[in-house]
Amino acid sequence: MLTDNRTWVIVLAGGIGSRFWPVSTLERPKQLLPLVDDGPLRTDTIDRARSLVPDERIRVLAGEHLVEPFRSSLPNFPADSYLCEPLARGTAPALAWAAWHIAQIDPDAVMVSLHADHIIRPREAFQETVNAAVDVVLRHDLLVCIGTVPDRIEVGYGHVEPGERLDASGGLKAYRVRAFHEKPDRETAHRYVEAGHLWNTGIFAWKARTLLEEIEQHAPEIHRHIPLLEENAEAFFKVVPTSVIDRAVVEQSERFAVLGATFTWDDVGSWEALARLHLSDAQGNVIVGAGQTVESSDNVVFTDQGSVVLFGIENLVVIRTGDRTLVLPRERAADLKELLEQLDSEA
């Protein structure tokens, strides 16, 4: 458990996981799927949250269609721990609602925001890092982003440029944020890694009051609708614009710190993640499900129905689920969101 007994944990459990299409869909997004271990990602995340705070200080933010799958897999989790989003409006309105909700109870309470679809190991290092992040929040009244040291060049992640060193507990390294850099090109990402920038994990800690203040300053188009929450969540979500917290607040705020994590982290962001999270064969093929390769190398295969056989194939992602089969080059795995937008426009 965390040292501070006023901290809350918010689990962001919405999102479609479009880069895991066709397995991940609106009705069955990736956080409900056993993509890495035998159990779904959501179960691991709730266990992680429970290692920090008691159940009564955990809130799960999810669309109404996802609450029942959570409840069925977590029968002992309190029913009032779910904040059901009436409409999908992105992480900024969702976290504004969560901050308002917690501020009604304790305005100076610290919120730790987690995603339901990340892989984090080991648990002890995660607890140590979050405890230090909460300590930075309480010492400096800053908003804290948890960052990790890059182990490769990655254009799909936000990068954090550290500045002035700050005190942090447990010997961890914390810094004022000099700048956030969103999803650079490959050459720029390489420069960031060489310069000691960190990846933005999307795990944040901040006081409920402080987040609401920053939303008021940097996202007034969201803040002006917060009084509607006195009525109900539906009134708020009907009128609030869609926005993500990174663009609405994180990249604009001058009150951010970054804390270097001691855990390993993966956002399981695309099919390419399976190559990092599963063992490959001698030819570099990663196979999840029933698959076989002959004279093939460096492929990623996932099937939850039937089997897949590859012959003389290299560097492909091959996905089979239900009545759909997807085949694409591995280097295009991160582009699936754009493919879905094109398919939707042509439908």
Tell where the protein language model's regions lie, with residue ranges:
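Solvent-exposed alpha-helices and their adjacent loops that cap or buttress functional pockets
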Residues: 1-5, 12, 51-53, 104-106, ...
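Left-handed beta-helix
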Residues: 1-6, 206-347
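Conserved N-terminal catalytic core of the sugar/cofactor nucleotidyltransferase
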Residues: 1-11, 19-29, 34-131, 148, ...
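Fold-independent oxyanion-binding glycine-rich loops
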Residues: 14, 63-64, 86, 114-116, ...
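Conserved beta-strand scaffold positions in the cores of enzyme catalytic domains, especially
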Residues: 32, 82, 143-145, 255-258
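Residue-level signal for inorganic ion chemistry
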Residues: 42, 98, 117, 160, ...
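A short acidic, often aromatic-flanked loop/helix-cap motif at beta-alpha or helix-coil junctions
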Residues: 88-93, 152-154, 186-187, 265-267
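Conserved core of the sugar-phosphate nucleotidyltransferase
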Residues: 122-224, 230-240, 257, 306, ...
